[in-house]
Amino acid sequence: MKHGFIKVAAATPRVTVADCKANGEEILKAIHEMEKEHVKLMVFPEFCITGYTCHDLFLQRCLLDSAWDELLHIADETKETDALIFVGLPLRHRGKLYNVAAALNHGRIVGFVPKTHIPNYNEFYEQRQFAGAEEEDVEFVDFLKGVINEEDEFWDEIPFGTELIFECEEFPEFTVAAELCEDLWVPAPPSIRHAINGAHIIVNISASDEMVGKDSYRRTLVSGQSARLICGYIYASAGEGESTQDLVFGGQNMIAENGSMLAESRRFENGIIYSEIDVQRLADERRRMSTYPAVSICSHTRVGFSVAEEETRLTRKYPQYPFVPSVKEERDERCEEILNIQAMGLKKRMEHIHSRSAVVGLSGGLDSTLALLVMARAFDRMGMPRDQIHCVTMPCFGTTDRTYQNACKLSRCLGAKLTEVNIKEAVNVHFRDIGHDPDIHDVTYENSQARERTQILMDTANKEGGVLVGTGDLSELALGWATYNGDHMSMYGVNASVPKTLVRHLVRYYADTCGDEELKEVLLDILDTPVSPELLPPKDGKIAQKTEDLVGPYELHDFYLYYMLRAGFTPDKIYRLACLTFDGIYDKETILKWLKTFYRRFFAQQFKRSCLPDGPKVGSVALSPRGDLRMPSDASARIWQDVLEKIEI
């Protein structure tokens, strides 16, 4: 359970209707399979001990006695099983019959959760046999009186009620509550109360029959509820073996976490699905959301259970590019939306200040290319001619012919006005003014060029009555890879919350959809150009200064950035996930090296982010000091760095 990962599973064993012993054998067989995978939370379907389709046989004492006996047998056989287990059966209580989820832990029955909402419509007639639970105080009942020896170490009254939260004694954030089938389909499911009272995982033991299209509706319910409640949701449904007299059960099992489907079974095939739910992330996300209610300490009864602490082997996958959807259709839709957000942000700013034009420094690189594409879209939306977009290319010591030519071609293809200002002479004059040797290629040599360009762009914007559009992206801002008061500064930064890995896809999307072959060719060549600030002289006419050789691969830094800010993960957890995700691409030494660089630069460069220009937020991670990141410029990175130093490779 290191880093908060809980190994969980949903199982659909084959049932024999009304044969509790046979069903118990199948349940135990599945439990033993899950034990091999070190599962800590095992969930079975509704009425898995009897079968859901017993109908009026549920009124037979013989079946009820057999179900109870089999529950005790399963409990006895799982004394050594290190897990919390949920199974379903009919249970007699206070003269009524209830449909319950029984929770088992190390041979003990630790709780009974009755179904609240009993369906009696369409194909369902459960009210014929079962009573619905009342939302009332939990009872502690001597269900085992006369069944076991009172001196037995497992003797205890068993809590019965809907308001139960099962809390792990070794890991308090591992909290579980249960609801049953129909409970999820009603306007106010019990899981709402469970979640806001501290349950990080909801289990649903279900027997949901199949109809055309019902599977997608169930999937939406489960993923949506996990997102709404910021919880893990495990759904185990009845499958093959149930009576097909009138219905068919497909065994659709699902494991979801905060809106993401971690695992789903193939329908019409019994079996087990596995995944790992990150309860630390769920707890952190709830704490971050100020509108999520504080946990009440009195409305639910806490029931303790125990599992051994161990490091969970991870099988769930994390995307290498968390900012970029992996499915092309979703990616294209996301790109279109982002371009519109950027364009609308710029449009509003220009209209507000009555701007007649816009200015951008065009280098032939990715970021300035994206900024120009956004400007073209904004001008189209405003009905303004694109020749009022003033592109300025400013070659200097490090400019290569490839980037220069691409800048010229790009502005021409988009119908923007292009001005060339060679800044070599101005920078050399500046070197003489400050007494700097131009043969010393240090930070002064580089930053003087960046600040000269910004001065030209600012003054050009004033001259043209326009706004200077910034080009810096989210990844550069996170690393502080920008010259303070140089390319760091603008009048409106359209790329400020777009990470570098996403910039590439936005430009690629524009190339694929623009309908202009010449423009597409230019954009594809820009995509193929190494990322560089071009502040050092080229070698043999080619780019000598490659950003990713200096600060590290952007795909790693974007991964680090996402899981640090969006998820709040610790450095060692990010390292673990990066090693898993980039296995075979980067070795552990490389991952750790650049992770240390990331934290060092992220903290040291906050002073640049503290005075960022305005710019539109486009995703869940942003660095604006006025919005998403309120961070002091002089905070110490020591405790994060200490964690990294303790990592053993």
Residue locations for each model-derived region?
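ATP/NTP-dependent adenylation/nucleotidyl-transfer catalytic domains that generate, transfer
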Residues: 172-174, 230-231, 240-243, 257, ...
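Enzyme catalytic cores with a strong preference for nitrogen-chemistry domains
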Residues: 1-359, 377-386, 418
